[in-house]
């Protein structure tokens, strides 16, 4: 399926020369050269299939592939996620003159980043969000009020994955100018940039477009935060997404309740979208050239409940003010309670540290420790099940040998 007539290349999908060596090595491991495979990027994952994007003769092509585990660069089998680069081959007997053949992913290229979030259930492992993300955009509405705790948790996830993080404030036209200024000037710690796209003066996604230009950006936020509205605005420059009909909507949006600003889950699965290229632009149009080179957006479903990351170092990075005071404590294992020489308690006493922020830090650290313990217990159970299964198989083999011997 051809997406649109344009001058597309792999670079349009976020590829750059540093990936080339990994692709060549993966092809060699599979027993061929790069010319024997199609290099594609996973744009969506459904229950039974993947959607892949690649290019052919300057056109962006959408491919379909059955859902199956693929070997990664460690020789282990796992399922590709949105944002992954994969080597594929067409499946014989599929496709037609008007429809590309189905493809079979054979290898996943090494990931530069792997964004995950803890599962809301006790027994599940971390849930993948996207791979090879350069920047995480936290989309947070100004109405009824931004959740600092939620922003801090998203920020910690970004730090755990090694990606930059930006806070994008939406629905600023529903609060006073003073409130918007306050939200913009006093964000949660750890974010690299704070932008507001919606004010009394209109909806302006240009600062976000400039921020994500040439990068792969993932958008996370609660349901009704305005993620899909923002993505539509980035995909359709000059069109106000609040007043637009569904004619220009790539991502369908829905209304939110006036009482609490909450909405239904509009985006039901993660989807990777390519920012429009500079079609028809002149060679000297450097602005369009920059915006068309590898700018990729990943829209995600709204998150109702977000657990803390199990990476305590990422939490310390998010709460760098708290961890800075903690490093000055007399004892390295200080619990920041009643120990003598506690620099954190001193900062709380003299007003240098916000008590509410410190309490959020304590809760996240405690939750993180419980998640690590739960993960260890889960790994132990899995290992024990594998050990028991191997023992049973061994006993069956031994009994069959004894039976034959008799």
Give a label for each model feature:
Residues 164, 171-225:
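Canonical P-loop GTPase G-domain recognition
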Residues 149-160:
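Histidine-anchored nucleotide/phosphate-binding helix
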Residues 223, 228, 233:
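Walker A/P-loop
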Residues 137-142, 168-170:
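Conserved beta-strand segments of the P-loop GTPase G domain that flank and frequently precede/overlap
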Residues 50-55, 88, 105:
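SH3/SH3-like beta-barrel fold
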Residues 59-79:
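Beta-strand/loop nucleic-acid-binding surfaces
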Residues 1-8, 15, 33-36, 72-85, ...:
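Helix-rich effector regions associated with P-loop NTPase G domains
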Residues 36-48:
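Structural detector for short beta-strands of small beta-barrel domains
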């Amino acid at each position: 399926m051809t997406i649109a007539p344009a001058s597309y290349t792999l670079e349009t999908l976020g590829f750059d020369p540093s990936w080339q060596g990994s692709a060549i090595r993966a092809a060699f491991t599979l027993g061929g050269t790069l010319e024997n495979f199609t290099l594609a990027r996973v744009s969506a994952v459904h229950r039974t299939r993947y959607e892949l994007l690649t290019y052919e003769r300057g056109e962006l092509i959408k491919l379909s592939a059955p859902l199956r585990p693929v070997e990664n660069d460690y020789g282990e089998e796992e399922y590709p996620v949105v944002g992954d680069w994969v080597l594929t081959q067409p499946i014989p007997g599929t496709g037609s003159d008007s429809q590309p053949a189905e493809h079979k992913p054979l290898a996943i290229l090494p990931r530069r980043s792997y964004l995950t979030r803890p599962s809301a259930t006790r027994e599940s492992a971390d849930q993948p969000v996207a791979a090879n993300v350069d920047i995480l955009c936290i989309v947070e509405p100004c109405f009824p009020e931004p959740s600092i705790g939620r922003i801090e948790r998203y920020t910690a996830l970004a730090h755990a994955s090694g990606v930059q993080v930006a806070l994008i404030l939406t629905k600023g036209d529903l609060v006073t100018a003073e409130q918007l200024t306050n939200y913009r000037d006093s964000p949660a710690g750890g974010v690299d940039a704070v932008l507001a796209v919606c004010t009394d003066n209109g909806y302006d996604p240009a600062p976000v477009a400039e921020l994500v230009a040439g990068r792969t950006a993932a958008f996370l936020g609660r349901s009704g935060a305005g993620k899909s509205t923002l993505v539509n605005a980035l995909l359709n420059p000059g069109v106000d997404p609040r007043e637009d009909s569904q004619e220009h909507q790539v991502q369908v949006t829905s209304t939110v309740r006036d009482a609490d600003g909450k909405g239904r889950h509009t985006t039901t699965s993660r989807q990777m979208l390519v920012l429009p290229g500079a079609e028809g632009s002149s060679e000297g149009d450097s602005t369009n050239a920059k915006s068309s080179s590898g700018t990729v957006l990943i829209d995600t479903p709204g998150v109702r409940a977000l657990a803390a990351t199990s990476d305590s170092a990422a939490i310390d990075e998010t709460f760098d003010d708290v961890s800075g005071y903690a490093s000055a404590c007399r004892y390295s294992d200080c619990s920041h309670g009643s120990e003598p020489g506690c620099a954190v308690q001193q900062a709380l006493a003299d007003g240098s540290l916000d008590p509410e922020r410190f309490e959020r830090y304590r809760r996240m650290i405690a939750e993180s420790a419980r998640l690590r313990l739960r993960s260890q217990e889960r790994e132990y159970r899995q290992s024990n099940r594998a050990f028991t299964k191997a023992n049973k198989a061994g006993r069956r083999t031994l009994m069959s040998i004894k039976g034959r011997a008799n």
